[in-house]
Amino acid sequence: DFAHANDMFLHVDGARISNGVVALDSSFKEMITDTGVDLLSFGGTKNGMMIGEAIVSFNKEISKNFKYIRKQGMQLISKMRFVSAQFIPYLEEEIWKKNAINSNNKARFIKEKLEKFSQVEIINESLGNILFVKIPRSWNEPLQRKYPLYVTDERENIIRIVTSFDTTEEDVRDFIDYIGEIRQSETSFHR
């Protein structure tokens, strides 16, 4: 409402929109169309597609010149049909939903396991596939040896953990076991 009341368009970056829809047990219609979104970048790449994001316009004014804008913005590749073709099974067979359920469930599984470590603090109550976790700074180096580690807050040492469409229970167990090894080696060292 604020955007439209101030003559602005409302764009939603939907890179993880499937995760949000699944997490809230909602629908794309409820989350996007019914809320007055004008333009959605509908994500596929972060939810299992090889490559591809779709720009979906719900606003006739924006749609008028969109083919021109798309070309001028260098978003029209010569083999676009191969990128676009992925969306057919992705949507019709609800691959988007299956993949989002998996990544959200694996994040929840990690959260449940990490909560058992007294040295760990879960910062966000994420329903999706991203966790922000405060860990001891001494854990950074050993974690970086085995996993890509992204520290989002250097001062508080908060890391970002992201699960994906292909994260397995074995991946989660390996990660949690490794955290346990780090904690154990630190405990043994300080005795």
Residue ranges with predicted function:
Residues D1-K134, W139-N140, T152-T167, F175-I182, ...:
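Conserved PLP-enzyme active-site core in the AAT-like
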Residues L143:
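Conserved nucleotide- and phosphate/pyrophosphate-binding catalytic cores
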